[in-house]
Amino acid sequence: MCATTIQTNRPGKKPTQQTNMSDYRSITWNDILTHKQLSDDQLTWDLDRLRNYTAVTNRGNTFGNPFIYHYQLANMLDCKRHNKKHLRDLFHDPVEYERLIQSTIKKNRKNRIPANDIFECYRMNTGSISVFKASTAKYIYKKYSAGRVLDPTAGWGGRMLAAHVLGIEYTGFDTNTNLKPAYDSMLSRLNDSRLAMRWEDCLQAE
């Protein structure tokens, strides 16, 4: 039997509890979709970490990533590696899902909720969806004294988030309009008039 301990330093910390193999089998697809959702206090906490990060060196930390996952995880889950099965397909295939559970238990990741165990194991097995870290973007902006950012492929929003905490103008372009609802929610939460998204090909923009 595999047991993991749930621990977190985020605001709204949940009580420590033990989970076992049966907990993995009780996970629903909605649990996978929502397991990185944060409270308003947790979103603020993550933004404050990014804002207070000096970015004198590029340490590659994950400040800002939880904020991005909160809004973009469903979109990330729509992506899959070439010739690899989608997590949704594995989830709805009893045989394949059992294999994923066994692989997850074997890796026995610590300090994670069960849905995240499964998500992280899938990423390790098939290759992860890359997020351009907001902390790295902040480092670059500061190093080159950026006063305005034109982002031709906005992606998941890390570069926009870095511009926000530095108080500089940002205009992002992306042709994937499936991302628009998530970006609209991010922009509403940030409430920053210096940030703008344009849903068109940057090469065709005027």
Residue positions per predicted region:
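Class I S-adenosyl-L-methionine-dependent methyltransferase catalytic core
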Residues: 1-64, 68, 81-206
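Intrinsic structural disorder/low-complexity segments
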Residues: 10, 73-75
